[in-house]
């Protein structure tokens, strides 16, 4: 549904710099190795083209490669869709329900979030994917999910070719002795013999490609099921986190209210159709969304504003007592700090003795917060935020006994 309906816009191809990143280089390398080796193994050593089955098999391999690459590049270059710079709601009074992004100089539309990597506010942002070096969001969610489906299917087909090639080529070449196993790599397995013999180099290349194909099938297949779960609930991973924090906030303050997620249409099929359409274009403009009964366009954004206000209330001021160079895993801060470094792409921030930090959340040995640079921090115009070790700072006496609890303990408070 919609696999070939959406078209990569030509003007977006100017951004070829997205290919110059370790994610696309590895992803395209794996696709190239698996598809090329599968075709070579099929034609030369397993299923020759002069047979009907061999021709059908070869066409299927080409088809997998084309569909995988199409959806991959569509997800990369079409992009997730960005909130227009300077955007604001049609009704000026509605701006009170929205957060303002000072980087984009625009209000954050419902379901949009600012991506530090893309440096833009992304429509219905799910996450920034390093493998496509772009965000997964409103406009490319379908292509991204189809890529996650087609890649494991194509790799499963390729893995079958690799296994059968090695089996058919080695079956008559093994000789077992009392203490040894010998392989005669010069023995021919096909009649007529292949143009290129299946030697040690071909065996090693096929075995390597098999490992890549199986690894891709498992890893990317798991990502596909995660995305399908997100689509059927019509709830991105970020929105799942917001909903979890909403329940935590209500429980923490023992409030008499219930948070209802506004974008779950109550039917998996209806949620599915929000992303996958026959035209290949997702439903909606990325700024306004269909909502369930009893909610409005700003139900989620109002909850986000409540959480932001709550975060300010629960934040704790710290003073830096030891320098920190911003290393991801600083061994000089202790073994426990080294091995419990947060597994996230969020940055670490350099600290100098005497600076002040406003911490908003934390782990057992790490804290996350904003460096208080000057008075402009209060206005939100200047922010340097990230993770830093707990043992580099001490709590300011004016903040009493409050302390950002480790994230795993928040629900027990």
From Swiss-Prot:
Residues covered by the SH3 domain: 313-398
Cytoplasmic side: 1-24, 79-143, 216-413
InterPro entries assigned to the protein according to its UniProt record, in alphabetical order: Palmitoyltrfase_DHHC, PFA4/ZDH16/20/ERF2-like, SH3-like_dom_sf, SH3_domain
GO molecular function, one term: palmitoyltransferase activity
UniProt keyword list: Acyltransferase, Endoplasmic reticulum, Lipoprotein, Membrane, Palmitate, SH3 domain, Transferase, Transmembrane, Transmembrane helix
Motif Di-lysine motif mapped to chain: 410-413
Primary location: endoplasmic reticulum
Enzyme Commission no: 2.3.1.225, 2.3.1.-
One GO CC term, this protein: endoplasmic reticulum
First-level EC class: transferase
Coiled coil: none
Lumenal side: 46-57, 165-194
Lipidation (S-palmitoyl cysteine): 328-329, 343
Domain notes: The DHHC domain is required for palmitoyltransferase activity. The C-terminal di-lysine motif confers endoplasmic reticulum localization.
Family listed: Belongs to the DHHC palmitoyltransferase family.
Function (record text): Endoplasmic reticulum palmitoyl acyltransferase that mediates palmitoylation of proteins such as AMFR, CALX, ITPR1 and TFRC. Palmitoylates calnexin (CALX), which is required for its association with the ribosome-translocon complex and efficient folding of glycosylated proteins. Mediates palmitoylation of AMFR, promoting AMFR distribution to the peripheral endoplasmic reticulum. Together with SELENOK, palmitoylates ITPR1 in immune cells, leading to regulate ITPR1 stability and function.
Complex formation: Homooligomerizes. Interacts with SELENOK.
Protein name according to UniProt: Palmitoyltransferase ZDHHC6
Organism: Mus musculus
């Amino acid at each position: 549904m919609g696999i070939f309906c959406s078209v990569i816009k030509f003007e977006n191809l100017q951004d070829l710099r997205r290919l110059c990143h370790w994610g696309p280089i590895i992803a395209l390398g794996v696709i190239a190795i698996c598809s090329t080796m599968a075709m070579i193994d099929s034609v030369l050593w397993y299923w020759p083209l002069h047979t009907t089955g061999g021709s059908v098999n070869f066409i299927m391999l080409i088809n997998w490669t084309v569909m995988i690459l199409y959806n991959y590049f569509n997800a990369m270059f079409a992009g997730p869709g960005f909130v227009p710079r300077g955007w604001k709601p049609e009704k000026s009074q509605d701006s009170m329900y929205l957060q303002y992004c000072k980087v984009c100089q625009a209000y954050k539309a419902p379901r949009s979030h600012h991506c530090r990597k893309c440096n833009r506010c992304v429509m219905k942002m799910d996450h920034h994917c390093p493998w496509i070096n772009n965000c997964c969001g409103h406009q490319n969610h379908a292509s991204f999910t189809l890529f996650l489906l087609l890649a494991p299917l194509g790799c499963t087909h390729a893995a079958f070719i690799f296994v059968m090639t090695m089996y058919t080529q080695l079956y008559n070449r093994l000789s077992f002795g009392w203490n040894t196993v010998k392989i005669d790599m010069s023995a021919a397995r096909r009649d007529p013999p292949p143009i290129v013999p299946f030697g040690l180099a071909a065996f090693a290349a096929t075995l390597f490609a098999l490992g890549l194909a199986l690894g891709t099938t498992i890893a990317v297949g798991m990502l596909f099921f995660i995305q399908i779960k997100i689509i059927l609930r019509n709830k991105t991973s970020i929105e799942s986190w917001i909903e979890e924090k909403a329940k935590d906030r209500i429980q923490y303050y023992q409030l008499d209210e219930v948070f209802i997620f506004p974008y779950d249409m109550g039917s998996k099929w209806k949620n599915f159709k929000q992303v996958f359409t026959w035209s290949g274009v997702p439903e909606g403009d990325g700024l306004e969304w269909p909502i369930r009964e009893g909610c409005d366009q700003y139900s989620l954004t109002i909850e986000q504003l409540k959480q932001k206000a709550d975060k300010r209330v629960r934040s704790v001021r710290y003073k830096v007592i030891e320098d920190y160079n911003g290393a991801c895993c600083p061994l000089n801060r202790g073994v426990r700090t080294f091995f419990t470094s947060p597994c996230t792409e969020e940055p670490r921030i350099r600290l100098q003795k005497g600076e002040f930090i406003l911490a908003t959340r934390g782990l057992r040995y790490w804290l996350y917060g904003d460096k208080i640079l000057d008075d402009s921090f209060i206005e939100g115009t200047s922010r340097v935020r990230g993770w830093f070790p707990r043992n580099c700072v001490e709590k300011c006496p004016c903040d009493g006994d409050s302390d950002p609890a480790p994230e795993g303990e928040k629900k027990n408070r």
